[in-house]
């Protein structure tokens, strides 16, 4: 993978993906006929995805303000409560009218992307902003979070509108590929991982892809890029980076698998829902 979205030199490209995916999200929500359409997110309609985006975007702005002031943020909640807490946040905005909700999201989003655009190289790499669930993270993580949200949730809305076979744009999914390994690391279900000692491979085709070997042992997941997967107990092969991203977010069960069926089954049941 030649492109590293975490490097400052990738900033302009990453922010272009944010704007592109946000525009696609807005295209769906700006149609009033879509407001009450069910989405791929269980229990959420289009209006709730808008609520979710208000929740996280305003949350990022608040945390950025805390960091700029040099104040101490509340302790991270951890990932195991992420799904339930985000659900509460999204549904709390149902009291807003459609017009109020959309205006509030767009206002917050413009403020956040303006902050992203002004980040210096030192800030991109070293300015830490405390995430509600993850704790202190470097600034470059936050544009990626926006790509995850706008990219995957636009897919969720299109799924609800009838396009069940859609893929994320290759560039969008490609930018997210490195982050999927981090998500896997932090979402290992400790009960499912008990006694698991496996090594498996990930292969993603195309210019955004590569090969990685993953080891799971003692409830911990580690990974490294490799040239050879011949000693992996199983291999998950994704022909499009979208398949990897949507599988990570448990929207689909994508890719082709080869190797030990027991290992494949363990991997598929290794992660809790985020």
Where are these regions (language model features)?
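A glycine-rich beta-turn/hairpin centered on an aromatic-Pro dipeptide
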Residues: 173-214
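An N-terminal domain-cap segment
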Residues: 2-51
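Amphipathic, well-ordered alpha-helical segments in soluble domains
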Residues: 21-28, 56, 108-111, 115-118, ...
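C-terminal interaction segments
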Residues: 227-274
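Hydrophobic packing residues in well-ordered alpha-helices of helical domains and bundles
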Residues: 15-18, 102-105, 143-146
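Short, contiguous alpha-helical
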Residues: 33-80, 129-189
């Amino acid at each position: 993978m030649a492109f590293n979205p975490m490097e400052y030199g990738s900033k302009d490209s990453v922010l272009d993906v944010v704007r592109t995916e946000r525009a696609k999200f807005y295209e769906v929500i700006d149609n009033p006929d879509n407001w009450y359409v069910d989405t791929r997110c269980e229990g959420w309609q289009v209006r709730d995805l808008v609520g979710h985006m208000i929740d996280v975007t305003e949350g990022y702005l608040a945390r950025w303000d805390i960091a700029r002031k040099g104040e101490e943020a509340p302790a991270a909640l951890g990932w195991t409560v992420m799904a339930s807490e985000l659900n509460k946040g999204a549904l709390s905005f149902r009291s807003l009218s459609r017009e109020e909700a959309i205006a509030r999201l767009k206002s917050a989003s413009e403020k956040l992307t303006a902050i992203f655009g002004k980040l210096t190289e030192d800030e991109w790499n070293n300015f830490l902003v405390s995430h509600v669930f993850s704790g202190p993270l470097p600034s470059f993580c936050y544009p990626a979070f926006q790509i995850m949200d706008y990219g995957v949730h636009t897919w969720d809305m299109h799924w609800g509108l009838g396009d069940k076979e859609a893929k994320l744009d290759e560039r969008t999914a490609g930018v997210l590929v490195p982050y999927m390994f981090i998500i896997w690391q932090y979402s290992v279900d400790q009960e499912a991982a008990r006694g698991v000692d496996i090594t498996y491979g990930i292969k993603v085709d195309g210019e955004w892809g590569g090969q990685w070997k993953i080891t799971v042992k003692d409830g911990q997941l580690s990974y490294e890029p490799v040239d050879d997967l011949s000693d992996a107990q199983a291999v998950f092969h994704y022909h499009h980076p979208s398949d990897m991203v949507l599988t990570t977010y448990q929207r689909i069960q994508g890719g082709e698998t080869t190797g030990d069926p027991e290992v494949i089954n363990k991997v598929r049941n290794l992660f809790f829902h985020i």
